[in-house]
């Protein structure tokens, strides 16, 4: 369960950040519904807050169950949440295009998702590549999209490639750590078995086989 702590801490940070953004939206002149763009941001904040809260509640529920239940359901749950988080970052980035030409949200959300989760290589390739394609398919329909399509495509592809290699590095590191742990556990089991055999031999007469 200690391996879940970084994910839980990150989810709590996301909850706090979204709560702050919702409060700031409410305090702005005109509120969160003054324009369609503000409404879009508002509902994205609410959606991420709700999904993250549900994610945390499910983790707590799984932690209270038996260990096999946690092992079975946590990784698929984490994969789904990572895909959702990347999609959320892309939607915010598309809204940003109506007030500028920044890919900052797409960049830090994608790289953070790669660094804070453990995905199999095919999962990271599918999530990050699909997210990048989704972004670049919709960018031309934003005000500054046609004029900046090439630069946005290049930058988003570099971010996606970086996210894939970051995710791959963390995955290989996790696999190596688990393999080393399993080897140590097997060696400890062998040592305990040998100690039991030696203890039995020490209390057994070698000629008669009697203790």
Name each region found by the language model.
Residues 2-10:
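N-terminal membrane topogenic signal
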Residues 15-113, 131:
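Hydrophobic transmembrane alpha-helices and their membrane-interface boundaries in multi-pass
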Residues 115-117, 206:
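Short conserved micro-motifs on helix faces and helix-strand junctions that flank
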């Amino acid at each position: 369960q200690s391996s879940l702590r970084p994910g839980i801490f990150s989810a709590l940070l996301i909850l706090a950040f979204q709560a702050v953004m919702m409060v700031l939206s409410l305090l702005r002149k005109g509120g969160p519904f003054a324009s369609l763009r503000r409404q879009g941001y508002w509902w994205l904040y609410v959606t991420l807050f709700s999904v993250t809260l549900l994610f945390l509640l499910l983790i707590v529920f799984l932690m209270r169950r038996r260990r096999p239940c946690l092992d079975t359901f946590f990784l698929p749950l984490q994969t789904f949440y990572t895909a959702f988080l990347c999609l959320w970052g892309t939607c915010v980035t598309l809204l940003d295009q109506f007030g500028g030409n920044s890919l900052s949200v797409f960049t830090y959300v994608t790289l953070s998702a790669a660094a804070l989760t453990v995905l199999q290589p095919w999962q990271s390739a599918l999530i990050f590549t699909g997210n990048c394609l989704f972004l670049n398919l919709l960018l031309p329909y934003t005000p500054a999209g046609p004029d900046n399509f090439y630069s946005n495509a290049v930058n988003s592809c570099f971010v996606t490639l970086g996210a894939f290699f970051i995710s791959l590095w963390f995955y290989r590191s996790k696999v190596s750590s688990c393999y080393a742990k399993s080897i140590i556990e097997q060696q400890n089991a062998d040592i305990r078995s040998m100690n039991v055999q030696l203890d039995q031999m020490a209390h057994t007469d070698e000629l008669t086989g009697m203790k």
